[in-house]
Amino acid sequence: MSLDSNPRIFTVSRLNAEVRLLLENEMGIVWLVGEISNLTVPVSGHWYLTLKDSQAQVKCAMFKGNNRRVTFKPQNGKQVLVKARLSLYEPRGDYQLIIESMQPEGDGRLQQEFDQLKMSLAAEGLFAQTAKKTLPEQPKRVGIITSQTGAALFDILHVLKRRDPNLPVVIYPTMVQGSGAAIQIAQAIGRANSRNECDILIVGRGGGSLEDLWCFNEEIVARTIAASEIPIVSAVGHEIDVTIADFVADVRAPTPSAAAELVSRDLSAQLQTVAHQKRRLNSAMERYLSHQQRSLSAYQHRIEKQHPQMQLNNQSQRLDDLNQRLMNHIQQRLQRQQYRVENLTLRLNNLSPTKRISQDKLHIEELKRRLLDSMDRNLLMQRHQLALAAEKLDTVSPLATLMRGYSITHNQDGKVITSTKQVELGDNITTRFADGDITSTVTKASELS
């Protein structure tokens, strides 16, 4: 027996390993329809079976981690659709399939179509988040695309009436199951876009089997949803039901009722929020007004203390006080003089000589006259000094200055204007006269040359 030069020689185990790698790497994932036979379930929990048709068979294994996700009970003789990868059991050299998922043949075929369309549309970018449109915060009109006799429509309308009874609704009736349903759904979406009377659409129906919901997995529905200029909320079946329409829609709601919750405002909650904000605003306004009132009272008190009339009143009161003190001083002096006269009279009365008495009387009368004259002069002088003091006070009085034809001008901040440099053209200024105020606008300002 002759050998080629440098032949590649395998061991059996090496050959089986190479073949296993070749099968797994080259063939990849396959979908296979067949009938179950020779099903065994050892204590490990793995499944071992044979898939066959009328002409051939292949050994299969489905490990515990994958078979626990199977939703039906496999039995010998049952037709199934499996997703598997090719492999080789090296110890025996047996070619086999490692099953990753298993479904009854009917459901499995639909699931395969679902997965293929999903992958195709995803590759085109129809599921991308950047393609999603933002839902309006407060829709003005909601469109509903569903069966007009289905429970889904009742659920949606019930929720909308409870949350926002004034929200207008437009119903676009369509089939949602069976032959021709997908075309009708696509036409309803197109009709809603052409009429452009709604700013958000709910597309959906109630729960059902995979076949019942299949129209929402059709490519025509998916592409029509993606092309819609109006944002669409999908609401197909129950929370566990997932359709191609859910992936393409701008937002997916788990149920029709949840979709109605999503697109509507809860008016009662909003009214409560508005009432709370109103109470907070009123409280803040009351605090602000109270603070401003206290500040205003303080400013008013300070202004009143500095007001010319207040200063005039203070000066007038001081004059009254000085006048009263002067009158008291004169009265005390008169009383002392009167007391002295009475003492002298008493002393004279105690002297017996008549001549002395007469002379003393004359002297007393003279003294009395002189005293009265002196008192009159003194009183006149005091009154004259008081009048002079009053005139001096009057000359410095702001009110007297105003009475002589002068005026005082303030700017908008209440500050006295003493120079033309303190005003700008267009400023509003207030001029005070003795009998009132005049408000004027500066149209010209010039300095004395």
UniProtKB/Swiss-Prot annotation:
EC category name: hydrolase
GO BP annotations, alphabetical order: DNA catabolic process
Main localization of the protein described in the UniProt heading: cytoplasm
Disulfide bonds listed in the record: none
E.C. number: 3.1.11.6
UniProt-listed Pfam families: Exonuc_VII_L, tRNA_anti_2
Gene Ontology molecular-function annotations: exodeoxyribonuclease VII activity; nucleic acid binding
Annotated keywords: Cytoplasm, Exonuclease, Hydrolase, Nuclease
Cellular component GO terms held in the UniProt record: cytoplasm; exodeoxyribonuclease VII complex
Compartment(s): Cytoplasm
Catalytic activity: Exonucleolytic cleavage in either 5'- to 3'- or 3'- to 5'-direction to yield nucleoside 5'-phosphates
Source domain of life: Bacteria
Quaternary state and interactors: Heterooligomer composed of large and small subunits.
UniProt function note: Bidirectionally degrades single-stranded DNA into large acid-insoluble oligonucleotides, which are then degraded further into small acid-soluble oligonucleotides.
UniProt record similarity statement: Belongs to the XseA family.
Protein name per the record: Exodeoxyribonuclease 7 large subunit
Organism encoding this protein: Aliivibrio fischeri (strain MJ11)
